[in-house]
């Protein structure tokens, strides 16, 4: 019964993820338009979403998300046999997937899922799901955020361009709640190594960093268990 319940929960999470991804660009276009109108109300243009500089990309059929997320939730519960811990871990992985997908396709990271990841990490520390205490989780999150924030501004000052995006330090804030400060060098090394490997294979001139940060979180967590 619980396996079926987790399959349904995963399916609902998949549907929610699909709608969030599918509506991300239209919502962003509308938000930019509304901000423009507020700044220049006397010069209100007619909004044409199809003429916007950034357009939505296909994100797959909603049924695939329902099935994929449902199976993921089910498999996690089958092996873990702990309802709350499974739910916490499954939602964490779902957030990482959404953040990675959006950054890979649009090179954009919304602070909203990153903040959800942050609070979810704190909740996990409070429930003793992670190796960190609540205070350690907070300290680590601030440290991760600070390091990425400094890297962002130093690279912008030194290279006159962004080596990291603004969304990356918001993502680092969320990731920091899952890893100790001691693991920061290993986490960065794995993320950079993954990025370099994919860069060599793909040959793309620019790669988003968030997918590698998310993968590095999973790998680093597995190594340090």
Language model segments and positions:
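A membrane-topology feature that recognizes alpha-helical transmembrane segments
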Residues: 1-225
